[in-house]
């Protein structure tokens, strides 16, 4: 393989790595945002004393157990 061919393969590998990294990062951002929203909702319910209210406790078993 010539030097030009090696350089071309190197550039293709860098480009492919960048594309894969970019798309997986965007997917990860969506999951992180959803997790953060759920965590803030759970924290808000806990702060308001949801687990002491029978109806709230019944509607949110994931927090109150």
UniProtKB/Swiss-Prot annotation:
GO cellular component, one term: extracellular region
Main subcellular location: secreted
One Pfam family named in its UniProt record: Toxin_8
Disulfide bonding pattern of the chain: 50-56, 51-64
Domain of life: Eukaryota
Signal peptide range in chain numbering: 1-21
Tissue: Expressed by the venom duct.
Domain notes: The cysteine framework is I (CC-C-C). Alpha4/7 pattern.
Keyword match Secreted: yes
Transmembrane segments annotated in the record for this chain: none
Residues modified to Cysteine amide: 64
Annotated family: Belongs to the conotoxin A superfamily.
Residue positions assigned to the propeptide: 22-48
The protein's name in its UniProt record: Conotoxin Bu19
Location of this chain's protein in the cell: Secreted
Source organism of the structure: Conus bullatus
Claim: Transcription is one of the keywords in the record: no
UniProt keyword annotations, A-Z: Amidation, Disulfide bond, Ion channel impairing toxin, Neurotoxin, Secreted, Signal, Toxin
InterPro entries (alphabetical): Conotoxin_a-typ
Record-level Gene Ontology MF annotations: acetylcholine receptor inhibitor activity; ion channel regulator activity; toxin activity
């Amino acid at each position: 393989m010539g030097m030009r061919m090696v350089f071309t393969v190197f550039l293709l590998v860098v480009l492919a790595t960048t594309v894969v990294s970019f798309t997986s990062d965007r997917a990860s951002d969506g999951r992180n945002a959803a997790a953060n929203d759920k965590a803030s909702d759970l924290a808000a319910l806990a702060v308001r004393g949801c687990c002491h209210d029978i109806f709230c406790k019944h509607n949110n078993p994931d927090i109150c157990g």
